[in-house]
């Protein structure tokens, strides 16, 4: 972060971390204090004339504060709600000053790029997505945990070689990438090279690197409902499309899972998805439909079975 500050001429940085992570908070406090003691932070760092310091700010765990403008609003001491853009943070951000925001993974790459050179970093990955990506691998998989892979690695390699495959002899059914707002990727796309563009093209996204594996016993309608329940709870309520739209979508999904829906409900659900994508204020509402749209795209037969046959094909 200090390197980024030097590059753009900033003198103050903030690390925003959830208060529910006390170990992370404690370690960051120690690291910041040690950096000050070593002269890596503060006034006139190494007699360079460059001043830079870092403050730690704790968040209350709101999912919407992962959106950059809501995060800045929270750091300022206000309720974490997104702001309209423009103006963009690079022109008018934290405390009305020009601001850049990056996640920890981005900053962690900077020292290695400086030490090894940009060519080294660009030698990994794909043409448009350079370097590596860290995924949190979980779900119905033998080996769970954090895995770092070069961009362009296939989903099959992650699931079968790194993750050790699906346990108990079950078949792979889908993987959801990008956290609660990501899409579900079916087995037909197991061999697609993972990068930002490819994930978007098949209805998912990279996000911060969540990767959840599902087996043949997973009900994809239940999965869509599960993630939408989370989004409903985490919506800040500032804009109507997200505040009301997600609730209407959840009501329809509940009818479908109970065998009480009609095919007209399915059409309405899809219509609401596109409405949220187009009209929500921030990325939380814009991406909330991804789990629904991706499961409709690849597992529509399961929705129809719930509606017509009043039962779940996955059991």
Label every PLM stretch briefly:
Residues 2-19, 167-173, 246:
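Glycine-rich phosphate/pyrophosphate-binding loops
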Residues 11-13, 17-21, 26-48, 188-315:
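Ferredoxin-type iron-sulfur electron-transfer modules in oxidoreductases and energy-metabolism complexes
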Residues 14-18, 48-57, 171-178, 267-268:
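Beta-strand segments within the central parallel beta-sheet cores of soluble alpha/beta enzyme folds
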Residues 2-4, 151-167:
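Short amphipathic, charge-patterned alpha-helical segments
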Residues 25-151, 163:
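Hydrophobic alpha-helical positions that pack around
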Residues 20-25, 62-65, 71, 79, ...:
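Flexible loop/turn segments at secondary-structure boundaries
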Residues 22, 139, 172-192:
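Short acidic beta-strand-loop surface patches of small beta-rich interaction domains
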């Amino acid at each position: 972060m200090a390197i980024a500050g030097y590059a753009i001429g900033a003198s103050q940085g903030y690390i925003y971390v959830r208060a529910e992570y006390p170990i992370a908070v404690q370690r960051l406090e120690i690291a910041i204090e040690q950096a000050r003691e070593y002269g890596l932070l503060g006034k006139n760092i190494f007699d360079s004339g460059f001043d830079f310091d870092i403050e730690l700010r704790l968040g209350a765990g709101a999912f919407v504060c992962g959106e950059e403008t809501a995060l800045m609003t929270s750091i300022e001491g206000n309720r974490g709600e997104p702001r309209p853009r423009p103006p963009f943070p690079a022109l008018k951000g934290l405390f009305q000053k020009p601001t850049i925001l990056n996640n920890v993974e981005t900053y962690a790459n900077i020292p290695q790029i400086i030490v090894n050179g940009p060519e080294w970093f660009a030698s990994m990955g794909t043409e448009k997505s350079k370097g590596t990506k860290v995924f949190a691998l979980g779900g119905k998989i033998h080996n769970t945990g954090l895995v770092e892979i070069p961009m362009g690695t296939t989903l099959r390699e992650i699931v079968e070689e790194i993750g050790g495959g699906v346990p108990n002899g079950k078949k792979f059914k889908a993987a959801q990438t990008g956290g609660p707002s990501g899409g579900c990727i079916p087995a037909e796309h197991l061999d697609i090279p993972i990068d930002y563009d490819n994930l978007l093209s098949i209805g998912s996204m990279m996000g911060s690197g969540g990767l959840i594996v599902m087996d043949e016993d997973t009900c994809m309608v239940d999965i869509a409902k599960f993630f939408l329940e989370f989004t409903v709870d985490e919506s800040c309520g500032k804009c109507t499309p997200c505040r009301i739209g997600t609730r209407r979508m959840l009501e329809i999904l509940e009818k479908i899972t109970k065998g009480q829906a009609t095919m007209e409900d399915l059409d309405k659900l899809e219509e609401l998805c596109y409405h949220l994508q187009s009209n929500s204020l921030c990325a939380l509402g814009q991406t909330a439909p991804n789990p629904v749209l991706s499961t409709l795209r690849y597992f529509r037969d399961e929705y129809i079975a719930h509606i017509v046959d009043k039962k779940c094909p996955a059991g």
